[in-house]
Regions:
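Acidic/polar-rich alpha-helix caps and helix-coil junctions
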Residues: 1-4, 8-178
Length: 178
């Protein structure tokens, strides 16, 4: 049920410019979703609180995690991700739509942490995935060994799920790999 709500909520967010009631519907869903996801001390979110969260910078955000980024990392740990896939890449950064979408993506990232569902979000929104080499204590990033990105406007073929072996054996062309 929560997965269906996320899909519906994303649709409401993308229709905010066309439908004046979409904002209220999206906020209602986000609050219901968040109340079920975060039980301790949950406070109802408003459009203003979501925009404030999405436009603030979080210099100490990486301290919340075991791993830490290094000076050679192109990014610091941040709850917001750059969206490269259309139509999400055309949203005004820090605007109501982009802010609410970032909040929804953050909640989905939290909910689906160990379920493998994040891969579909990284593909859908064109979020860059970095692969890191960590030091001996597994806390500090030594270097980035690879990244899967749609930044240049072309979808990275490694994001596509490969077809099953029996389907390929039957003659269907497999999805390309890099």
């Amino acid at each position: 049920r929560q997965r269906q709500m996320c899909i519906r909520d994303r649709a409401y967010i993308m229709k905010m410019n066309e439908d004046p009631t979409a904002l209220d519907k999206a906020l209602e869903d986000i609050n219901l979703y968040a109340a079920n996801l975060f039980s301790a001390g949950f406070k109802s979110m408003t459009e203003a609180s979501i925009i404030k969260w999405a436009t603030e910078t979080y210099p100490d955000y990486s301290e919340l995690y075991v791993g830490k980024t290094s000076v050679s990392s192109p990014q610091t740990l941040n709850p917001k991700k750059k969206l490269h896939a259309a139509p999400y890449n055309t949203l005004e950064e820090g605007g109501p739509q982009e802010s609410m979408l970032q909040a929804l993506i953050f909640m989905r990232r939290y909910q689906f942490l160990h379920e493998g569902m994040r891969w579909f979000d990284t593909r859908r929104f064109g979020i860059t995935v970095y692969r890191y080499l960590l030091d001996e204590d597994a806390e500090t990033v030594v270097q980035i060994t690879d990244q899967i990105s749609d930044e240049n406007g072309t979808a990275d073929p490694r994001r596509a799920l490969q077809l099953p072996a029996d389907v390929i054996a039957a003659g269907l062309t497999p999805n390309p790999r890099k």
